[in-house]
């Protein structure tokens, strides 16, 4: 195992905590403007990034929430017009959660500043550095998901 110097670990821990806090604040602000809670907005985001409709159980797995909590999230998202429940065409006993086009487009502007800041930061790196950053982020996400979310 790599012998991490305590100062390096401390710095990276601080960076990750700061990024996490800023991300939470950002999504809380976005959620408020959408009329949602931060949890509801992140579950909507999970559903939007999926390859297709998800079951409530799958949303629970991806979010780390209980299935009971996810049922409440889906109810609120459905009332707000962001998702709808549909029967699985292959198994009518299953209910899938499908993102609706609804008013999502009117909230796209909320993400523009975040996108612009990402472009601004990435433009300061050459392609080789971006490759290293991307590899780090992929490993961090994979490891964090296994160690924290899937426990």
Labelled PLM ranges:
Residues 1-34:
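N-terminal leader segment of winged-helix/HTH proteins
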Residues 1-4, 128-151:
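C-terminal regulatory/oligomerization modules of transcriptional regulators
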Residues 27-65:
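N-terminal helix-turn-helix DNA-binding core of bacterial DNA-binding proteins
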Residues 76-131:
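Charged, amphipathic alpha-helical coiled-coil/dimerization segments
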